[in-house]
Amino acid sequence: MKKSLVTGMLLLFTLALWTSGDLALGTQLQKQLTQESTLEKVLKRGTLRVGMSTFVPWAMKDKTGKLIGFEIDVATRLAQDMGVEVEFVPTKWAGIIPALLTGKFDVIIGGMGVLPKRHLKVNFSIPYDYTGMSMVANQQHAKGFNRLEDFNHRDVVIAVRLGSTAATAAKKSMPNATLRQFDDESQAYQEVLNGKAHAVVGSAPTPAFYALKYPDRLFLPLKETFTKEPIGIAVRKGDFDTLTFFNSWIRFVEADGWLQERKHYWFETRDWETRVK
């Protein structure tokens, strides 16, 4: 009886050691993860480094060379609410995810569509915007075209930005067309303006802006967008503290009306055009 009691006490003591050890390890791991999170690094550094690429009206330069646009406003407001400065890191779109993964910047805020293929490499916040793909075409070369099927031929050239969801949408919707890809979206639009491509696929409302700007050379062949995709903030995988903060922040700026006001200004008006001309 005495031997059994001693054995039982030893088992309880051993179990207690295991439990306390697990708790200590868990606390230590949680502390380590918090210290290593992007959120903590940004707060400690005092600067939020944002990876982005220029495309109108999400991110572009004004007359003085300063970056402006919807994504610029989003990143600037986010940094302000965090109590830090913002630093923009212009990056070619095709290499923007690898640059995030290697630590060139903290987050991607650049109109990035939340795609399953991208989700394998990075984590995304909840959507802060939704966009769809649209087209603008050359009046001479695409005369009479008003359906996706009209562009789905090998002799039709579609211009897109390299590595973009526009490229993915074009390949899926017009698999037979010849795709011509560019590092900068403005180059894709210039290709159509120069008559070297039939059309360009891009996120709405940019194609409509170009059609309005060059009514003698361009037109909108489709009445509506032909895709719809959510836009989120991209962060490195495993960084759940940062992701949770971004999700809470997005809900906050949606609730106070700021996000909708910025969308209206950049996507539903053309008041900003005087700042870039």
Segments the model singles out, each with a brief description of its role:
Residues R49-P57, L67-Q80, S134-Q187, A204-T206, ...:
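Bilobed "Venus flytrap"/periplasmic-binding protein-like clamshell domains
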Residues T76, Q80, E85-D150, L218-L220, ...:
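Acidic, polar ligand-binding/catalytic clefts
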Residues T27-E36, D73-D81, Q139-A142, E149, ...:
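Extended ligand-binding regions for polar small-molecule ligands
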Residues L48-R49, V84-E85, T102-G110, D155-V157, ...:
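Alpha-to-beta junction loops
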Residues Y130-A137, A204, A208-I250, T269-K277:
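Periplasmic-binding protein-like
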Residues L29-G111, L120:
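Extracytoplasmic small-molecule ligand-binding "clamshell" domains
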Residues E36, I72, E87-P98, F145, ...:
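Short helix-initiation/N-cap motifs at beta->coil->alpha
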Residues M1-K44:
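Short, low-complexity disordered leader/linker segments with a strong preference
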